């Protein structure tokens, strides 16, 4: 059964140059689980936001859409740039991401894994990262 939460019944204030805009975002996992069902939101510069909810509510799934790790139906726009395959590197350069399991990035077993974490996750081949 889907969970629906009303975040605010107050109409959002207009702002110049939205920092983040999500419009009618939908995403289902391969097993059929609907994680996002028509999510829309707009954040302006300086907004402070908390995204809370129970396990499985779609919080992490939404975050993974904000820098193109997952793709669904709908539109995501970051600082005026639509999230498309063509401008994905530019979007990822503006959006930081910390994974849920801090052991995946904070405590690397080797110096190479620590230093290479960013370049590898931005799509550089391991051979090129090792040469640099």
What are these regions (language model features)?
Residues 103, 109-120, 130:
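Short helical segment in ABC ATPase nucleotide-binding domains corresponding to the A-loop/adjacent helical element
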Residues 67:
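Helix-to-loop junction immediately C-terminal to a conserved catalytic motif
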Residues 52-54:
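The feature captures the beta-strand-to-loop junction immediately N-terminal to the Walker
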Residues 60-61:
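Conserved Walker
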Residues 9-22, 26-38, 50, 85-87, ...:
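A short, flexible loop at the N-terminus of ABC-type nucleotide-binding domains that lies
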Residues 72-84, 91:
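Conserved ABC transporter NBD signature motif
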Residues 57:
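ATP-binding Walker
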């Amino acid at each position: 059964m889907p969970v629906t939460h009303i975040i605010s019944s107050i109409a959002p204030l207009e702002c110049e140059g939205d920092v983040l805009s999500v419009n009618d975002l939908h995403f289902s996992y391969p097993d059929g689980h609907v994680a996002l069902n028509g999510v829309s939101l707009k954040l302006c510069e300086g907004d402070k936001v908390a995204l809370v909810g129970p396990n499985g509510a779609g919080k992490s799934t939404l975050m993974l859409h904000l820098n193109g790790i997952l793709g669904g139906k709908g539109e995501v726009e970051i600082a005026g740039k639509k999230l498309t395959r063509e401008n994905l590197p530019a979007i990822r350069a503006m959006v930081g991401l910390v994974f849920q399991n801090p052991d995946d990035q904070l405590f690397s077993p080797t110096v190479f894994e620590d230093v290479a974490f960013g370049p590898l996750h931005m799509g550089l081949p391991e051979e090129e990262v090792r040469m640099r």
